[in-house]
Amino acid sequence: MYPLIPQTGCKVALLFKQLGIRNVLWLVMAALTEQKILFHSESFARLTDSCTALTALLYPFRYCHTFVPILPTSLIEVLSTPTPFIMGVHSMHDRELNEVLDTIVVDLDGGAVTLPENYTIYKVWIHFFTHIYLVIRYNFLIF
């Protein structure tokens, strides 16, 4: 039996509104390919909602790596782990964010997604990305 569809309220819609279709699709592809994803914001609620929304978008798959929507200051060195993760940190840690390597950094306040230099996307993902982008953009007429 399949797990229940995740109940997110308006969290998924808010993620699309904050980041746009293209950036959210980049994040979904990154999560599916086991990349490190780091959200940062001034709002703890926005961090939690965005991390939860991203994992909900993976349905019917489940995210099985490290998931910490709000990383405490005392554990900030965990960001240098080599394993995939989805984590959120308060924006007051800007200095530490500049030192994070091989990580996709998501600025929820500015609506920007920064991909690492070594991040490559395979041709099969380009086709998937383009198709899904067009379906969302033209059939649902959002953003």
Language-model features: locations:
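Acidic, Ser/Thr/Pro/Gly-enriched alpha-helical scaffold modules and adjacent low-complexity linkers
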Residues: 1-143
